[in-house]
Every structure is written in C-alpha cells, then in structure tokens.
Amino acid sequence: MRQSHPSRFLAIVFLSGSLALAQSAITPEQRTSRYLENVRKQPSLTLAFLREMPKGGDLHNHLGGAIYAEDLIDFAAQDKLCLDRTTSVLQPGPCDSSCDKQAAKPAVECGYRDPNFYNQLIDAWSMRNWERGHESGHDHFFATFSKFGLATSNHTGEAIAKVLQHAAADHLQYVELMHTLGGRQSAELGAKLGWSPDFGVMRERLLSGGLKDAVTTAREELDRAGAIVQKDLGCGTPSALPACDVTVRYLYQVLRGLPPEQVFAQILTGFELASADSRVVGLNLVMPEDWYVPMRDFNLHMRMLDYLHGIYPEVHISLHAGELAMGLVPPEGLSFHIRHSIELGHAERIGHGVAVMDEHNALELLREMAQRKILVEICLTSNDVILGMKGDDHPLPVYRKYGVPVALATDDEGVSRSDMTHEYLRAAETYNLSYTDLKNMARQSLEHSFLPGASLWADTHQFHAVAACEADVSRNEKTSPACQKFLDSSERARTQWRLEREFAAFESKF
C-alpha cells in the first residue's frame, strides 16, 4: 500500500505559491523591460516594440523640414509650380507645356506620369539615396530647403496636420514645432528701419514702426492653419483622427543668417508673439551654425537675447548650439557656443549639443548643465547625416554619464527620411539603452517642454510624483480628488499624466 506524503504535497503548494508571489512582485515596467531585452537582437521585433511605445514629446522639430518629399510634391502640384530640371529648384509658373526630358522647366505634376522625374524630386529634396563622397551630407541636407521651399508657402495648415499624423503614429503626446511666423514682415521692417547697436533704440524703433503688425500677422497665420488642421484631421467629429489628441505648440523660429537688424527684428517678434499668444511657447535661432554670418554674429545674437530676456523674462528660449564638428569650423569656433547660449542667451534647452567636448572646460560645463537642468535635444539621425557624428563619437553617453537631461528629437524628419520611432531604435541599438532609459527620456521631454504649469514630478531622478498624485501614479484607477485638482491647475502635469496612463496601458501588454 502506497504511503501518502503530505509534506511533499505541502512543499509543492508552498513552492507554487512562492513562484506566484514572485511573479506578482515583478512590476509591469520590469516585465516590459525583460521583453525588450529578449527581443533586442531581433531588430524587427525591437522596431515593433518601439513603434507602440509612448514617447512623450518631440521638442526639436522644424515644420519646414518635417514634411516628406511626397507631400511636398503634392503641395507643389496643387500650386501649379514648375521645376528647374538642372537644379531641382521649384519655380513659379508658367511651366513648359511638355513633360519631355528636354523640357527645362516642366510642371511638377509631370512627376505623377514619369517615375524617374518623381524619384529625382524625392532624392533632391531629401537624404534618400544620398551617398557619402559625391556631396557632403551637410551640403545636400541644407540645400534641400531652397529647392522645395516654394512648396511650403501656402500649406502651413496641411503641413502641421501631416506632422501631427506622424506624431500620432509614433505615439507622441506633444510636439513643439519651429516655424517663422510672420518672419518676412518683421525682417523687412528691420531692413527698412536699419541697425543701431543700442538695443533699446532698436526695440523702440521697431515697436513704434509697425512690428506689432507682424505679431498680428503671425497670430492670424496660426488661426488659419489651426482651422485647416481641425478640418483635415476631423477634430471634434465622430471621424476624428488620432492626431487630434496630439498637443501642438510653436517656437518662433529666428533666421540667424540674416543681417543684424533683421535678426533683432525677428527675435523681438518672437518675444512679443510668445507674450501675446499661448500657442507660441518660446523661440529658437536657426540656420546652419557653421555658416559665415551665424559664426560671425554668434555673440551679438546672444547679447540680443540677453537684453530682451531682461524685458520678457517669462518667454522660454531653446537654442541650436554645438551642431558642429572638428574641421567644419576652426577650433576656436567649437569652443564656446553651448556655454554662451546658456549663460548669455538664457537657453533652457540646447538643440544638438554635439560639440560639447570641444568647449572650454567641457567637464565643468557638463556639471553646470546637470545642475541647472539644461536639457539637450538629441537628434541622432540628423547628426549622423549632417555631421557624420554617430556611435562612440556622439556625446549622448557623456551627457547621460554626467546627469544632463536628454530627450530624443527628429529635427527634420521629412528631409532625413526618419521618424521618432527610428530615433528610439537607433538610440536603443547604438547605446544599449534599456526600456527604463528610453521611458525616462520620454518623461524628460515633457518635463522640459515649454508647456505652462507645475510638473507632475517632485523628483526627476527616480520620477516620484508630487504628493497630491503620489498614490495615483502607481494605480491605474480613477484619479483621487486631490490629484485631479492638481492636474486641473497645470497643462504640463496633465500632459505628463496622460503619458503615464499610456505607459500603463502599453506595459499591460507584457
């Protein structure tokens, strides 16, 4: 007769219970992190994982470069534009009546019937099929804007709608778009009134001379564009696209390659516009940093910002700085742009920051950036194709080592032929970043957005929530009254809260 073994039975029950308890002790974030580690050597599965991952905000996105060439072709065809076949530069009509290869100025719509012509446009207006050696990535990249620029003039609303659709597909919650709103009007006014080295005189001259009209023009442009976005996306209707849920704000984009009187006029327009319209949350200075005028006038531009920041201290500033590499400019040109952008230009965020280790006292600067919580907008694909900076040559690991906050960004995703998902993929594969690393970058993007209001986070090292919402963050349940009151008081916190809810939904799949 077989004897029973109650002790063995109890041991099995105990072990089963312990295993279940251990499994339940693993957090959803840990399970999700394990999944990423398990598929890390399978790029297609990693890509699928990252495609669905919530990514927070894209803080460095130029509207003019965000549109894919295929959409630009459509815009140009709608406007009956022509192409200089030799240079691939758009021209106003009338176009040649023929689409033959002999036509020097064919209509852009000829591309719909000629695949070779269509592909020529895409390659000329983007980095597609660009190869190192024939033309530098830097030169090809920046040349695209003068080629397709005419196509964007009348399609701001449609372009914004396209960007938001891409953002929604990438599971972004927020986008800050750089755009020169009413910029031509203020630049022309600056040229008309002329230059004075006395910034106070310049400001009064511009304000009394009609600069407020440029601000009004910019706001009207946003009104028109916003109406088109709502219509194209079906926002507020039963057929609304997911892009309607992406929050968009704008940075006034100053063209720093212009003469000083025009740059000052645009900077002043940016400060005035951001002070008057909540849709515009700050300003930035753009155009290639290594070009002659931006290099010559760099500190002059910083002094302009310093002066106007004193008058408009609430207006946020993000600056392109350190989008440089050895050989592109003389060594001394690499040595101060990031520091001066922060200390003189009052930048709260730095775009690119690739040349940080070429700065004077680079390690001291890194510690200062960490202490002051100056976020760096990391544009991996852009830095590769423009500067050839990638892998170990890129300072992303250095920024992370020194505790400088970082967030991934697309820069000009249409020209680069990339998107935010592939920025995350490049970061994960190149630097072996964990799910938690990527998650915290997404959180940092919203923490350092220029949205108004208090942060959801009391601590951005471990991401502990403020007291009112501390218990709510870890529970995927109805928000407590205290937390809801806090969220109602802050647009920034509401956007961060939405990201946390989307993280919870994403992690529940694993």
Name the predicted role of every residue range.
Residues M1-L10:
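Bacterial N-terminal signal peptides that target proteins for export
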Residues Q23-F510:
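Metal-cofactor-binding active-site regions of metalloenzymes
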Residues L10-L15, L19:
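Hydrophobic helical h-region of N-terminal Sec-dependent signal peptides
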